[in-house]
Amino acid sequence: MSERHRIGGSGLSAEVAVEGAELVSLRDASGDELLWQAGPEWPRHAPVLFPIVGRLAADTLRHDGQEYALTQHGFARDSTFRVTEESDDRIVLRLDDSASSRARFPFPFRLEMIYEADGETLTV
């Protein structure tokens, strides 16, 4: 199980995994779960899809005469993000390009996922 962080309190509370920066739980003030809780039908909750949504032809990105294997919905959902900021009601997770990512996606990037709970509102 991936490391998880909880934000929120008196209104909504949210739980975010560092693996994929995925929102894995969202509860209202009464404690009722509002988010799909992964099961055999679909093992995810709310995955971050980056750098693509959907599937490329033959799962291959072509750029400047080179081919890169890039599977459906990209790689962010299976990558470990780094927590760069955390408080009771806010968390920021970051994924930077690396040698591993450039083997699949030849562009520099910095992807930040920011989750902020304010009363009954979660902003992503």
What feature does the model see in each segment?
Residues 1-123:
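Surface-exposed acidic/polar loop and edge beta-strand patches at domain peripheries
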